[in-house]
């Protein structure tokens, strides 16, 4: 979707349907595997935006749906409208951003994937750096990067947890991939919580 399409009226069902079809065409696919409703348009009731996504599912433009940046209240609305086609929630979560813990827990209860964006905290203010000190301590003991420890801690939250860290260098990508192999002890997890 071009940015000019997303600036105005992006949450209206008719626009979401149009954008979804254009996205499938641009990707060269008949059907998008997982289509996210990324941001709530404050000018459009959330249930109406979800109805637009449902129409795309019903038309076969998408197979599965996800929602992003949602509260539990919005998630419940999406569940009601999208039913079992809703499979994923993508919210920010990191040692700095723990305010979506309730949504993370709710996803575990509901069998929904929780896709954690900005799992390393994204842009950080210097006054947030102390929040990573316990991760640095565990990393030093283990001989790995603290970023790998952060990702391993997040992945330890459950099988429903997925992380999507950003990276610019190949070695950073490879380090992030190894987080799945790092099994933290109960003592380490307690220290990080």
Which residues are covered by each model-predicted region?
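Alpha-helical macromolecular-interaction surfaces
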Residues: 1, 18, 48-51
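Short, small-residue-biased leader/transition segments that mark boundaries at the very start
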Residues: 1-7
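Active-site mouth loops of central-metabolism enzymes
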Residues: 8-14, 38, 43
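Short, acidic/polar
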Residues: 11-27, 73-76, 99
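Structural preference for long, well-ordered alpha-helical segments within the folded cores
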Residues: 22, 31, 52-56
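Active-site groove signature of glycoside hydrolases
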Residues: 24-45
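Beta/alpha (TIM)-barrel catalytic core signal, keyed to glycine-rich beta->alpha loops juxtaposed to Asp/Glu
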Residues: 44-193
